[in-house]
Amino acid sequence: MAKRPNILKLATKISLESMTYMGITYDDPEYKILEPIIDDDMCAIMMHVRLETNRTVEEVAKRARKSVEFTQEQLDKLCKTGAVRYRYVDGKRCYFYPIWVPGIMEGILANREQCDKYPVLGESFEAYTRRRPEMLAPMLDSGKTGMFFMRVMPVMSAIENDSHAASYDEVRTLIENATAISVGPCSCRRARRLMGEGCGHLEEDMCMYLNDNARCFSEQGYHRLVTKEEAYEILQRAEDNGLVHEINQTPGFEDTNAICNCCGCSCFALRIAELFRTPRAIRSNYIARVDKEKCVACGQCVENCQTNALKLGQKRCTTDPHISDTYDTDASVPFHRSSYNPEYRTNRSDVMPSGTAPCKAECPAHIPVQGYIKLASLGRYTEALELIKKENPFPAVCGRICNKRCEDACTRGSIDDPIAIDDIKKFIAEKDLEAGTRFVPKMLNQIGRPYTEKIAVIGAGPAGLSCAYYLAVKGYPVTVFEKESVPGGMLTLGIPSFRLEKNVVNAEIDVLKELGVEFRFGVEVGKNMTLDALRADGYKAIYLAVGASKGTPAGCPGDDLKGVFTGVEFLRAVNLGKRPTIGKQVAVIGGGNVAIDVARAAVRRGADVTLLYRRGREEMPAAGEEVAEAEAEGVKFRFLCAPVEILGEKGKATAIKVETMTLGEPDEKGRRKPVGTGEFETLAVSAVISAIGQQIDLCGIDAGSKLRLGKRGTVLVDPATYQTDEPDVFAGGDLVTGPKFAIDAIAAGKEAAVSIHRFVHPGQSQLIGRDHRDYKSLDPATVAVPIESFDNTPRQHAHDGSAEEAKKTFHDLRGVFTEEQMKKETERCLGCGAVVLNEDQCIGCGICTTKCKFDAIRLEKVNDTHGREYFRTLLTVAGNTPAAIGRLVRKTRGR
């Protein structure tokens, strides 16, 4: 492309007038952002427009020595590009241009059509805001607050009762004094999208212009005018989404012309705090303060902190002198590039190196256990349910079937018994079983209206339902395709009702229906519908969650005889109300939870059940309490024996031959390998049920696709995003991991929803700005519990039906805590986690205060400065003389 000296001259003129001239070449962003959009005639006219100086068309025409008609035509085109603006003075348009940033470049990025045509515009905006502010960074870190051209404003709710708050601390002042307000795209997010580096926060309807700016950009068609009431709604929606309010303070506070709603993962102004580590440059007059005693480490403030100034840590004292939950920050350390954080968009962490509450860290879904326990203790049950559902849409289901890794890791368990976390959750989730009391979340997204991109979910098991739930909450139209006649997958067809009543599953699925999720049953994608057919029907992304719903045969001679079932096959029949013929003498093969479920279900069908397991009792993967329940109901166990052959007469199973085993050397998983002894025994049976594993049946979904399969038939995906080799196809749950627990599938479904949201909006990265949810538990052995305040209350137990009663019914006879029991159990929680604040990194936005339900974090006013006009700011940070700016430029270049 030919170099254009006239455009270089124009860029130089703007920079000189802005006092930011550092020498401009054809490779610099100031040139590259103007070159594609300004032709020679436009350039000739713009040379006679001046920085922040009002000139009518007649004045510009006179200076350019062109006709008024020609000049007006070029000015109109320049305004359309966003490079030139106008304001009305005495009813007449007066033309000017602002500084580069915030100013010209944001204006250029407001024009979507030209941006999509010339992606270099976004690249230039990014480059300028990265390279040019760097020369000011050393001065901006001098301890002065809010000295940069953009400045954070605290959320109104955080300071509304603060007697020290001034009018220039309140964004309300700007809204109320505005003569016009418009809303339009976020230029930073648009630039990121053009570069393929979007963070998942979308650009539309987020940033507001005020007064003359609002009139100019709405008349150009890039913004839309809004009322003050609508402006407050936009601000509230931004806060709900965790976005920070910032203002352009270059005209001075009273004449502020823009309010941005920013995220730390895309905003070029917040980058000052994160990349250069100079948060004071943009900080409001406030800073956050954490009340550690009130904090319950729910993590809501951490996840929404745009500068990663908050992390989860420990509340209790530690016996290890090497553990410290504090930040080592020193403002006196000289500023240097070595202190930059160039990977800030991908390296944020949620947890201090010493770890945090194990209940949250070890849960696959990272549910804020400590938080909902505290809410329950206060009787705030709906809020507790809401908090749980931020990570798990099925608390009533999981309160009955979860494998309770939170309890296994509970710090209290290192003292006596762990907190009965699942029973507390089960008590809270009783509200979900009734339509009048269940919690149905409101749609939450940036645009305040549903998205139009249709999403298909294949499989109505826990992974598919979780993905559908979180996509629906975000406002997407979701259709779930299920080959069975009922939803729930293994929750409905693979777990017997005495462990999970179907009305519980259906009640929580009803929430999805209220959210607008559509279900289509009897549709087997891969057989009567293909992936291409879904695409042709307008689905922009597909989530595969068909699970591992096929049983594994016994794998020995005779496993094809009548009366031989797989565990999955048997449980499916039972859950559909059928009565498979099993007779009175049933052998169940396996040692996992499915084998226990099968054995207990067979007992309820009147059978005498013997469970055969090739290892010892200690090696059984089944939950200990379920093994005990099975024993109490009459299931007999034969350990260290493996099936060799199923014998039969007239095509029907009548006996099973087993070999006595011994345990040899550990296998690749560390489990001692069973080795045959050569001793055999034959047991009479009327049926054999093999519950030794589950298999994946894709039903031909992968035919003709780029899907890659693993050794066990699992679908291979990116481990962080769940994206397959078909870019619009994502997968999760047992289909990816092989058989695991419901909570694992639920967690995977939520992560896939994050990925799908990013995928259906072109230009969004799957990894940039993503919370990688890398949690670490504190070491319970180092927690110091004060004996004088230790609550010795024993663990509470719900009243369950007796084993004799239980084995006669398929109803779940396990009890639910009384409210008194629940309150006693919540008091046993040690509350070992708390948030840790890095005050030096805090920007005083107050978003954290809007997320905390425990009054554990607030804003405190620590400064009393307000916005100052651009040139005063520039001179102040540079040393109060134009010559100092030159010295600063030379110093910056030399570093």
Report the location of each language-model feature.
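Ferredoxin-like iron-sulfur electron-transfer modules
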Residues: 36, 66, 95, 246-259, ...
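A short, conserved structural fragment
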Residues: 79-90, 310-311, 857
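A conserved FAD-binding loop/helix module that cradles the flavin
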Residues: 598, 735-760
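Glycine-rich dinucleotide-binding loop and its adjacent helix/turn
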Residues: 428-449, 507-527, 551-605, 709-725
